[in-house]
Amino acid sequence: MPTLNDELKTFILSKGASLVGFADLHEIDTEARDGFPFGITIAIALNPQVMSKIKDGPTAAYYEEYKILNEILDNLGSATAQWLIDKGYKAKARPATFSEDKANLSAKLPHKTVATRAGLGWIGKCALLVTKRFGSAIRLTTVLTDAPLVAGKPVNESLCGHCTHCVDACPAHAHTGTIWQAGMPRQALYDAFKCREKARELSKKSFGETVSLCGLCIVACPWTKKYLEKAANKIR
């Protein structure tokens, strides 16, 4: 007989998700998780054809992809929360993109933090989630719930090793090159303000929009390159 995990994962994947993970959030500050004990990470892979065109900075196609996936994720998060509510549980979907702490350009509970607790990947030197299947070429959202889910095994250490591809690719020189470990503050990995400033400069130059979007560290990652190459080989 299918478990709650099985039923929920099947539902989310059927709606277009690329990855789904379940996280135990008990060790995270209660306020940050709005009192919910579990989190669901939903990920959708970025279009490999769009990402492969990023060479010197963000493109208009990447910006459109970013907006489309954010809308899809918001709808998917809401649908997931409603599915749980219909089952008699409490649930709350969080927006795909938001910043609660304007002083640090951060959220009180980042999607990528929940994703590492769910076992989907680790945080790279670019301060983004890295997955074995898609690299960093994904967008994320989170649903918080009190449903008694069986959580995945948390990832607490980086697999980046000596690799510095994302650090070297950053035109803002925003990354420190520090290897991530669970609980490490984001500031130890990169300067969000340097990243934002350069991204806005590049997007304005590329397609006339001042947005905090770049993509160079994403496509520089060897794990992302594996995903893009695999996708390209399928097309050939």
Which residues fall in each region the model found?
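Non-catalytic, usually N-terminal nucleic-acid engagement modules in DNA/RNA processing proteins
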Residues: 1-69, 73
